[in-house]
Structure formats: C-alpha cells, structure tokens
Swiss-Prot record:
Tissues expressed in: Expressed by the venom gland.
Signal sequence interval, chain numbering: 1-20
Propeptide: 21-26
Keyword Signal on entry: yes
PTM notes: Contains 4 disulfide bonds.
UniProt keyword annotation of Disulfide bond present: yes
Major location category of this protein: secreted
Family: Belongs to the neurotoxin 19 (CSTX) family. 10 (U11-Lctx) subfamily.
Pfam families xrefs: Toxin_35 (PF10530)
Protein name as catalogued: U11-lycotoxin-Ls1a
Location(s) in or outside the cell: Secreted
InterPro entries assigned: Spider_toxin_CSTX_knottin
Length: 77
C-alpha cells in the first residue's frame, strides 16, 4: 500500500515539474514545429518563419513554423 502511494506521489511530482517547465517557457520548439503563438520560442539554431494563407487573394490565416536559419524554401510546381 505504501508503495502505491509513493509511486503516485512520484508520478504527480514528475507531471507537475513538466507542466511548470512548459509554463516558464524553457522548452524550445523544434524544427518544423508551429510557432504562430510563440514566435520567440524556437530553439537557438532556428527562426520562426511565417506564411500567409490566401484564398482567392484574401488572407484567411497566418501560420508560422520553426525553420533552419539561412535556408530558402521554394515551391516546386
């Protein structure tokens, strides 16, 4: 019984630590991760690059992703 309670407390502590770390913003967003709402949260070797989503010439959304610095992406038609 004590082992079950101890295990539960340890799991609770681990989950609480992970949630606290996410709230403080220590964790960075990895390559190709979305950074629309957190533009400064990409890892140090990445930049947050944003794109406008257009429908019939009208912007309907804006999406941002963490991409490699100094890399150019081109649309292949």
């Amino acid at each position: 019984m004590k082992l079950i309670i101890l295990t539960g407390l340890v799991l609770f502590a681990i989950v609480s630590f992970i949630e606290a770390e996410e709230e403080t913003g220590r964790a960075c967003i990895l390559l190709y991760g979305e950074c629309t709402k957190a533009s400064g949260s990409c890892c140090s070797n990445l930049i947050c690059d944003c794109y406008r989503k257009l429908k019939k010439g009208v912007q309907i959304a804006r999406q941002c992703f963490c991409l490699e610095k100094d890399v150019v992406y081109k649309k292949h038609i």
